[in-house]
Amino acid sequence: MKNEITLNPTYWASVSGGKDSWYMLNVILNNPVKYPLNGVVYFDLETDYPFIKDVINLMKKRVKNLGIPFLCIKPRKTWKELYNKFGYPNRVVKWCNYNYKLDCKAQLIEWERSKGNQVNFYIGLCVDEEKRYKNKEYKNSIFPLVNENIEEKYILEWARKQEIYNDYYKYNNRCGCIGCPMADLKKEVYNYLYYRPQWDTYMRLALESEKEIEEKYGHPYSIWQGNPKYNTEYRMKRVEELANLLKGEINK
């Protein structure tokens, strides 16, 4: 078509600071011919674990020493602003992803497009995560770990030996945000033991959202599950019980 605009391809490694994206970045940097790289981007979220910032700083130092741009992009609205508008995110209304995290991605795409470029993202999904990397969400994406036939269990074994992760991968397989509504109890116990102030804050906010919804609709509600029995109050009690059991085992 005469009016069709041809965009120039650019290649950006999208890193979260979790185990897979860090391992992927190492693969990319060690194979510059196979994986051309215009820059590295980190979506800078308030809800990230403190150790993630330490990992990102290590990445940034290595990348900048190679003369490669490293961008940190924040969402245009803060987590608290969106919380005040939508309430606590849950398993159905995942604004923490679409309205928060993915806004960072949209900003990079808009910026590159304004220069006549089409962004291709390197994403840290492993070869045994087929359902995820075939998701239509990952349009214009490249998966180096898939190309290199690297399984998640191999990276998990590596991550458990990295002190910078503050024992996270000794108890968990994947890293998300501290207050994630999809988190299982194992992750919540880790949060309770290692990041208690943050855990307290997110539980308080979840309680407030549940109370508002219950008052509005006149029936019990749970952020975490479809059954309102398993609400935040129940979750807090269960996490405290499991955390005390774990501390008892550690102290034996």
Predicted features and spans:
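Nucleotide-activated chemistry modules centered on ATP-dependent adenylation/adenylyltransferase
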Residues: 1-252
